[in-house]
Amino acid sequence: MKFYALFIYRPVATILLSIAVTLCGVLGFRLLPVAPLPQVDFPVIMVSASLPGASPETMASSVATPLERSLGRIAGVNEMTSTSSLGSTRIILEFNFDRDINGAARDVQAAINAAQSLLPSGMPSRPTYRKANPSDAPIMILTLTSDTFSQGELYDYASTQLAQTIAQIDGVGDVDVGGSSLPAVRVALNPQALFNQGVSLDTVRSAISNANVRRPQGAIEDAQRRWQLQTNDELKTAAEYEPLIVHYNNGAAVHLRDVATVTDSVQDVRNAGMTNAKPAILLMIRKLPEANIIETVDRIRAALPELRDTIPAAIDMQIAQDRSPTIRASLAEVEQSLAISVGLVILVVFLFLRSGRATLIPAVAVPVSLIGTFAAMYLCGFSLNNLSLMALTIATGFVVDDAIVALENISRHLEAGVKPLQAALQGVREVGFTVLSMSLSLVAVFLPLLLMGGLPGRLFREFAVTLSVAIGISLVVSLTLTPMMCGWLLKAKPSEETRSRVGINRLLLALQGGYARSLGWVLNHARLVGLVLLATIALNVWLYISIPKTFFPEQDTGRLMGGIQADQSISFQAMRGKLQDFMKIIREDPAVDNVTGFTGGSRVNSGMMFISLKPLGERTESAQQVIDRLRKKLAREPGASLFLMAVQDIRVGGRQSNASYQYTLLSDDLAALREWEPKIRQALAKLPQLADVNSDQQDNGAEMSLVYDRESMARLGISVQDANSLLNNAFGQRQISTIYQPLNQYKVVMEVDPRYTQDISALDQMFVMNSEGKPIPLSWFAKWQPANAPLSVNHQGLSAASTIAFNLPTGVSLSEASDAITRTMTSLGVPSSVRGSFAGTAQVFQETMNSQVILILAAIATVYIVLGMLYESYVHPLTILSTLPSAGVGALLALEAFDAPFSLIALIGIMLLIGIVKKNAIMMVDFALEAQRSGQLSARDAIFQACLLRFRPIMMTTLAALFGALPLMIASGDGAELRQPLGITIVGGLVMSQLLTLYTTPVVYLFFDRLRLRFTRRAKPEDTLTASE
């Protein structure tokens, strides 16, 4: 009593305290960072190693395996996967959430150092690592184009100047440069000229290497001066290499230009990048796992003017893709929904109270509670994201409930003629415990969520804490500011009512009268209502089992990614043509804004594309509808497939795949894996629940297998090393020397001129100089025949692995796809040596599915414990919790009606309903218990009176919560797919709960009261017998 009076009788202090809370919230709002979702990125580190010319199997056994054994000992590694392709190995380490990325990086470097002695000696550089997830979509893509500069020169500017500077920006984890390679001097050899001049490839290589050296020359010094010695020992350009003497043939000098074409070109000619049909260099920027995407993008944009000044004016640098505009638009939509919710809630209050002064009270209480929450969010290190703003939108209906309960009860006393200050004090004292019970039991719902681990726990922690803080502030406001404003603003006698007020009042009285009559009938047919309650419990179970489920709603971020997979024996020239064809098809789609892509590198038969769609206001289709439309057109392209997927804000795992979801096959028997993977992939591709089924197992690449005749080699004076060196010199784009420049180092690359390697007959022209200096044709000691070889070798841990990726057709949920895969694997009879499991997002979905029911039950148990402690009763909490089945049925039926799968967002909606719908029961039970204790009423009369007295506040609070969630349910625009499931769940649950709990709660109350009396009667004879003894 003294607590309430302290604020009611000191209005100035109460007002100033509320203003202070609001100002702190405004300051917190201005300081809060902006993000699409809470920080849920797993710490990921990528280790890269190269050995030019080495086959995928050689890279896997000699490079990947030693590194994996060393890296596998690092603590906190969640998953380790590797991909070895021609000349390169990439290992992805995914760590637990609790691992600091910098500490993990130090452990990774130590593991690389430990494995160094086990790696091949011919590696041009030590393995390196990057703190970025290569499977994440870039947060920004920059393109460089020019009509005057070559692709190699553009790549040089991009990698030497731009990428280095951008990588130093805070928040940037990795900058990949694609579309070409660094400038180089290329020596294209003529095999016939070499044979005619009697010059071997090794001779040319040695001559070039010896002619271009960089060694210290020292200095000459006398008593007065010191001269630094400098020589022309380095050759920089193709023109300087052409006159180089590589051999003497019968005393005549053989120059390099006599046996080769020397050009200023690039290190690897098998790379291509394009943007909107124009050759381009791409800078793909990815953020650090812990970095804020909006802040990082803003820093990059701020640096772009300075970056443009560092490159020539003839180079055009453009932003081809930027993730931030759709994120900002989505957050603006949520903020708009929040404002609409506040307006609707206040409108509900006005319609019920029919007083401008009375409406002003919740109109002040709601903003104070919501704005004050921003201060707590800042102190907790949260961000303004879709989920935290959705929490505040939903909180609108909650925070007004507390004010409504207090305001309505005070208004009732005022209408009875009690003086304002006394009415405020008396009214808040009566409902203080009710408000406390409602708030604490609602916060209790989120305790299991706060303790939940893994990605779901991390994802919804900000949501739960934000909502809990808003409820906590609302609790304090409703017990302090609200009664103070009621005492000083409201009048003891209501003013003369207008015609509209009279009409609304008559409507409410009519509803209340109808409810009284129907409630009387229900109480006389309690068994029927009990059967209805049991039916809703059974219906909940059936609906939950049958409803389609997914991990997270499919987002439309306005960005698509595409992976090209062509025939495994395709040439680079043909692959570049496929890239151009695919880009032409996509550019013609009316929903597409721009498209960039690249191909080449270690895997010639693959490529990547990044597509920006037009803003939602300029297109009528969703991202998935655009993909469905393009899929039909892209399927007509022979010899290659392009798999498109919408970029999501959440992507789990470090695997780079050509679809959104993955199923991984593991085996210690590589032969068994290669035998069963095609069978499994073909079976899954036939399933109607899956789309775009593809695999990273590529073991059917074209290979020319050379078999050496070692006896002939010994007789001819040739070693295996000589023969292998010949092949590497001729066909491996061998880097034979280094050109040192002030800003970078460039290579001299040697290979046989591509004009002479158009078919396998090029091998007939190859020869080796034997120990006597005679040219020996390769065909004299080797035979060759076509064969198949893997283009890549994949590991997970230390086991051979193959990942089958898939997308979902429109209208199919992840649970339906997962069930279909599980059934197919069982029917195929896959041997135990080949193990299958979901990976990435699909794996987290499976884990979440197993914990959903436990989480809901834990929330119910927590609420029961809190209510039991508050009421000092085992029974009354059960009465209150009897409201939940009807809400669950309403929520699940609403999801079915809107064809929305049950996702994590819908799960949060169910948990919110646990907190919302029990408020009705709390208000009924509180007044019934008070009436029984003070009015000497029977249980039936007490609950009947409580239901009628609390009918208006119950209707007000329910409608306030419903209208608070309504903007989410009918949301459109950017990010609507995230908001809609939450709104649908809450609105559906509230409607069904309101229809049923007004009748089931009093029936359950009377049922438990009869049980209490029965046990009391049984206990009395026992007590009497004990006393007589």
Curated annotation (Swiss-Prot):
UniProt entry tagged with the keyword Cell membrane: yes
Pfam families linked to this entry: ACR_tran (PF00873)
TM spans (from-to): 15-35, 333-353, 360-380, 387-407, 431-451, 469-489, 528-548, 853-873, 897-917, 953-973, 984-1004
KW Transport (keyword) present: yes
Subcellular location: Cell inner membrane
A GO term, aspect molecular function: xenobiotic transmembrane transporter activity
InterPro entries: AcrB_DN_DC_subdom (IPR027463), Acrflvin-R (IPR001036), Multidrug-R_MdtC (IPR023931)
Membrane topology (UniProt): Multi-pass membrane protein
Keywords: Cell inner membrane, Cell membrane, Membrane, Transmembrane, Transmembrane helix, Transport
GO cellular component, one term: plasma membrane
Main location per the UniProt record: membrane
PANTHER family linked: MULTIDRUG RESISTANCE PROTEIN MDTC (PTHR32063:SF34), PTHR32063
Summary of subunit composition and partner proteins: Part of a tripartite efflux system composed of MdtA, MdtB and MdtC. MdtC forms a heteromultimer with MdtB.
Family per similarity comment: Belongs to the resistance-nodulation-cell division (RND) (TC 2.A.6) family. MdtC subfamily.
Protein name: Multidrug resistance protein MdtC
